[in-house]
Amino acid sequence: METIHATTILSVRKNGKIAVGGDGQVSMGNTVMKHTAKKVRRLYNGKVIAGFAGSAADAFTLFELFEKKLIEHGGSVSRAAVELAREWRMDRMLRRLEALLIVCDANESFLISGTGDVISPDDGVLAIGSGGNFALSAARALVENTDLDPKEIITKAMNITADICIYTNHNLVIEEL
């Protein structure tokens, strides 16, 4: 089976607000399979936003596991992120999962990987996926040089990314806290 490429997920934290956005394209090889995938969702009674890049089945498994970790740790995103990364890296079955996650609550944002990375950004901006570097660059420029709020920054940065990255489209889903 061909590798499924897809997605740009971007989170922006600015002036006490947080937003996470993702595009809707799913591609297999050089074929666009879906235009309206939802790769950003709310967890933990709407208090946490999570987005994924990579295999959808793997990501949903990780979303479920992350939400269990949130419940176990009383909603602490940092503790749940570290515990998920630890389990993901050490468990033989989970190690095979191919996805990256961005998770955010009102106070913290993290990128979580299967190699054990739990990264909190210095500047409030995180991006993953095939268009991640384009989105990260555009968002950082907009954060530093405009008065736009996080949702507006994500919209502009993701549209720039969709114009450049063939695996990213303009069908955006953006969640805010």
UniProtKB/Swiss-Prot annotation:
SUPFAM superfamilies: N-terminal nucleophile aminohydrolases (Ntn hydrolases) (SSF56235)
Cellular-component GO terms for this entry: HslUV protease complex; proteasome core complex
Cellular compartments annotated: Cytoplasm
Metal-binding found in the keyword field: yes
Activity regulation comment: Allosterically activated by HslU binding.
UniProt superkingdom: Bacteria
Entry's EC annotation: 3.4.25.2
Binding site for Na(+): 162, 165, 168
Catalytic activity: ATP-dependent cleavage of peptide bonds with broad specificity
InterPro entries named in the record: ATP-dep_Prtase_HsIV_su (IPR022281), Ntn_hydrolases_N (IPR029055), Proteasome_sua/b (IPR001353), Proteasome_suB-type (IPR023333)
GO BP term, pick one: proteolysis involved in protein catabolic process
Transcription among keywords: no
Signal peptide: none
Active-site residues, Swiss-Prot/TrEMBL: 7
Keyword terms: Allosteric enzyme, Cytoplasm, Hydrolase, Metal-binding, Protease, Sodium, Stress response, Threonine protease
Pfam families on file: Proteasome (PF00227)
Single GO MF descriptor: threonine-type endopeptidase activity
Predominant cellular place of this UniProt entry's protein: cytoplasm
Oligomeric form and interacting partners: A double ring-shaped homohexamer of HslV is capped on each side by a ring-shaped HslU homohexamer. The assembly of the HslU/HslV complex is dependent on binding of ATP.
PANTHER family associated with the record: ATP-DEPENDENT PROTEASE SUBUNIT HSLV, METALLOPROTEASE TLDD
Family per record: Belongs to the peptidase T1B family. HslV subfamily.
Its biological purpose: Protease subunit of a proteasome-like degradation complex believed to be a general protein degrading machinery.
Protein name: ATP-dependent protease subunit HslV
Organism field: Leptospira biflexa serovar Patoc (strain Patoc 1 / ATCC 23582 / Paris)
Chain's gene name: hslV
